[in-house]
Amino acid sequence: MSKTIIEFKNVSKTYADTDTTVLKDISFELEEGKFYTLLGASGSGKSTILNIIAGLLDATDGDVILDNKRINDLPANKRNVHTIFQSYALFPNMNVFDNVAFALKIKGVDKKEIAKRVSESLKLVRLDGFEKRSITKLSGGQKQRVAIARAIIDRPKVLLLDESLSALDMKLRKDMQYELRELQQSLGITFIFVTHDQEEALAMSDWVFIMNEGEIVQSGTPTDIYDEPINHFVADFIGESNILNGRMIEDYLVEFNGQKFEAVDGGMRKNEPIEVVIRPEDIWFTLPDEGKFNVKVDTQLFRGVHYEIVAYDEFNNEWLIHSTHKAIVGETVGLDFDPEAIHIMRLNETEEEFDARIEEYVEEEETVGLANAVEEENAEEEAAIQEAVKEALENTMELTELAETVNEILQKQENEPESENKESGANK
């Protein structure tokens, strides 16, 4: 069973001078050795959580637990937590070695031990041999690695990263995503990463917290959040989406765009107003009148791996489609999608209500699915038995026919000598 390393219990943060509440009753548990991401727009409260964990801000209410100890009153330098800031906060007047060794020198660690641990840390971030290099001579990615090496040199329980990739160019940022994830897994310590970049959050994390206006709107694995957004905000914030108003006719049957469609969601009231989400990559073009409905292509952009196409249906709903096929602006085409592509969102549903509903109807599906599986297995066995019996009967018939043929041949052979004897006597 995984150990809880950090816990927030009903934590809030209010700035008294402006009476502004930036965190509202936040509660969560983080397990040791996992990669967590706090994802949200500016002002959502994500960096406030990071600073409270680091000891740079005090919580107004609630308890902050680190490694089973309440740390609300523990100074920042007494917490086994390190922070990597967006600016990296490296010392430009020191070389790489001295930057990485700084914390150990302050603690009075033996010089040989310092040299050993600096070497180990630089190897982990692939900067061995850079010990004497000036900080001012390093690239952005190399500075990032030095900051990480300095942060991990005394093996903190938790590493906090505050928008630490945002200063890098796109290619280097993608490369560092792989390196950070690999480093976290090799070290086995807890990473808490703050970003406004959805791609970074989805690519690196074991678990993502979506934040908005000081609250956690939804949390889950990257796949869960992308495939099952809880509300309009999450669906719109994570990736690109087509979001429409609709009505849940009954379980697994939804109405939108003036039509009824088979879906895979359930657990809602009949005729309940809902919102429908369909991702642009889950839609494909057909000939007119051969899909679910027709749209008219309005614009398209080439994005390298796909065309991003905007089209409008007869109700003037905008549709975003990702396609590897180029469209013709102004043409009418059909749109099609599978039932699995339709995600249903209830209006004003909390994360707790969402989780309970999903669990309830998934268990229902699993029970029905098991019964169906048993029934199908029994039917298959019965069919196999019937086939075996049929084959045995056919074999028996073939054997009977063969036996009759053999008997006829033997009888014929027995009769032939008698005929020959009669002919021989007549000749004499």
Swiss-Prot record:
Membrane topology category: Peripheral membrane protein
Known catalytic reactions: ATP + H2O + polyamine-[polyamine-binding protein]Side 1 = ADP + phosphate + polyamineSide 2 + [polyamine-binding protein]Side 1
EC id: 7.6.2.11
Protein origin, superkingdom: Bacteria
All copies of domain ABC transporter, residue ranges: 6-238
Cellular compartments per GO CC: ATP-binding cassette (ABC) transporter complex
PANTHER family: SPERMIDINE/PUTRESCINE IMPORT ATP-BINDING PROTEIN POTA, SPERMIDINE_PUTRESCINE IMPORT ATP-BINDING PROTEIN POTA
Subunit structure: The complex is composed of two ATP-binding proteins (PotA), two transmembrane proteins (PotB and PotC) and a solute-binding protein (PotD).
Protein name: Spermidine/putrescine import ATP-binding protein PotA
Organism: Lactococcus lactis subsp. lactis (strain IL1403)
Gene behind this protein: potA
